[in-house]
């Protein structure tokens, strides 16, 4: 029988008081004319290309295979024509761009999958089907955040059905019309691990699947990062070099359930289109890899220079060419003003319109106020100063200041002892936000994790 765990209450963290929160109701998005697979979405992946510019592809057709994890296939998110295989410096793979044929009904169907019983399906058959249709890449490992190898088995699997990122969609709203497919997907996940499937959700959230055998429902409450998989894993099943868990987003669980019903790839994705510069912040239904330029056309304030972000304002990627597409694991598009201008004598002003974690501005007198955040860092990089700000936003049992210092000096031995293997870029996004030294800890932790993995 399924089990229910008590609520884990997070006290440390920060809910960013940003304007432009989305209305929690869904609308159909525009018909997308171009989609892409982005190389940076898949850590450590080295592609063997199976298509080239000018080739015709159908939905679910393999477009490249990973040299580093043999057999793992990445498939086309739409039917159409490959218009470009973008490469950057030193021929680094950037993107495969596809012009969508919205009139096409062609799709790849995996034989023997449609109508399969998710409870009794053979693990080998399920794994083979997920790999062939391209859904294997929905899983990521902790530690390191990579797509798992086909032969691996996780100690447990975490389903993230809670989202505390700024401007995020409510998973309960997205799941309301697709509960059956979500439950089927959960049942299938229990076939992939001998351990538990942890269904992580907000306190009192109406998330289906808690009664599925092999699923443990876990509730989390508190400020961001209460909704991040790193927080859940830390509290429920901590990892190490010799212990790996997988995590997956709730919309990918829906896609797995749909795959078991039809044998086909479901690329529907509900995202939050929100932020201070969005005219009508709301949830829209689009597709995997959608061109963000098309999503925001006519939706944003163009009177100022904008920064458009695929993902959270805390940890998303800037949506400029050749990365102007929805990231594989992103459930939101955020739009803020580009903070590339200096404020004359800004340090002398009381700061009624400025937010501060340290409450040094006059805005501290209006704690419920929300702010039109920009991309400005409020200064240039400087020395790291331990003022206790990192500890305020780190809910894990980790010495934040000491760990961050180890990351800066690339002391990977100390970083491992201090818990770096439990973290990824998104787990340190708040540390970057509150850092008085203006350090970017996301890139630093990735550099350290790469070194640790390489050196064993």
Curated annotation (Swiss-Prot):
GO terms for molecular function: oxidoreductase activity, acting on NAD(P)H, quinone or similar compound as acceptor. Keywords: Ion transport, NAD, Sodium, Sodium transport, Translocase, Transport, Ubiquinone. It catalyses: a ubiquinone + n Na(+)(in) + NADH + H(+) = a ubiquinol + n Na(+)(out) + NAD(+). InterPro entries: NqrA (IPR008703), NQRA_2nd (IPR056148), NqrA_C_domain (IPR022615), NQRA_N (IPR056147). It holds the Pfam family NQRA_N. Its EC number is 7.2.1.1. GO terms for biological process: sodium ion transport. It is an enzyme of class 7 (translocase). Composed of six subunits; NqrA, NqrB, NqrC, NqrD, NqrE and NqrF. Belongs to the NqrA family. NQR complex catalyzes the reduction of ubiquinone-1 to ubiquinol by two successive reactions, coupled with the transport of Na(+) ions from the cytoplasm to the periplasm. NqrA to NqrE are probably involved in the second step, the conversion of ubisemiquinone to ubiquinol. This is Na(+)-translocating NADH-quinone reductase subunit A. The lineage of its organism: Bacteria, Pseudomonadati, Planctomycetota, Planctomycetia, Pirellulales. The gene is nqrA.
């Amino acid at each position: 029988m399924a089990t229910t765990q008590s609520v884990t209450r997070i006290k440390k963290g920060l809910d960013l008081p940003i304007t432009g929160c989305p209305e929690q109701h869904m609308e159909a998005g525009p018909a997308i004319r171009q989609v892409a697979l982005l190389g940076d979405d898949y850590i450590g992946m080295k592609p063997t290309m199976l298509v080239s510019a000018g080739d015709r592809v159908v939905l679910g057709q393999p477009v490249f295979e990973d040299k580093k994890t043999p057999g793992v296939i990445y498939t086309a998110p739409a039917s159409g024509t490959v218009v470009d295989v973008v490469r950057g410096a030193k021929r680094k793979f950037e993107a495969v761009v596809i012009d969508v044929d919205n009139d096409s009904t062609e799709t790849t169907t995996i034989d023997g999958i449609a109508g399969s019983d998710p409870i009794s399906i053979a693990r080998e058959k399920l794994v083979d089907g997920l790999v062939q249709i391209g859904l294997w890449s929905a899983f990521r490992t902790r530690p390191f955040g990579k797509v798992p190898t086909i032969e691996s088995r996780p100690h447990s699997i975490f389903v993230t059905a809670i989202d505390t990122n700024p401007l995020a969609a409510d998973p309960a709203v997205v799941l309301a019309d697709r509960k059956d497919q979500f439950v089927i997907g959960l049942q299938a996940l229990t076939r992939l691990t001998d351990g538990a499937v942890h269904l992580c959700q907000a306190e009192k959230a109406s998330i289906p699947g808690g009664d599925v055998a092999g699923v443990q429902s876990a509730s989390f409450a508190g400020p961001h990062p209460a909704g991040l998989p790193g927080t859940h894993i830390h509290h429920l099943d901590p990892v190490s070099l010799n212990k790996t868990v997988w995590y997956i987003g709730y919309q990918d669980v829906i896609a797995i359930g749909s795959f078991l019903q039809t044998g086909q790839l479901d690329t529907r994705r509900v995202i939050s289109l929100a932020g201070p510069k969005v005219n009508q912040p709301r949830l829209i239904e689009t597709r995997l890899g959608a061109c963000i330029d098309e999503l925001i056309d006519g939706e944003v304030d163009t009177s100022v220079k904008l920064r458009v972000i695929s993902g959270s304002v805390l940890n998303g990627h800037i949506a400029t060419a050749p990365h102007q597409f929805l990231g594989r694991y992103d459930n939101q598009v955020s739009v803020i003003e580009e903070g590339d201008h200096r404020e004359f004598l800004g340090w002398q002003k009381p700061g009624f319109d400025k937010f501060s974690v340290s409450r040094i501005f006059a805005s501290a007198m209006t704690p419920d106020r929300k702010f039109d955040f920009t991309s400005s860092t409020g200064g240039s990089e400087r020395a790291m100063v331990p003022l206790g700000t990192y500890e305020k936003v780190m809910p894990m049992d980790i010495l934040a200041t000491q760990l961050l210092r180890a990351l800066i000096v690339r002391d990977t031995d100390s970083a491992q002892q201090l818990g770096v293997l439990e973290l990824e870029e998104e787990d340190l996004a708040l540390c970057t936000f509150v850092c008085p030294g203006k350090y970017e800890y996301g890139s630093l932790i990735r550099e350290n994790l790469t070194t640790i993995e390489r050196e064993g």
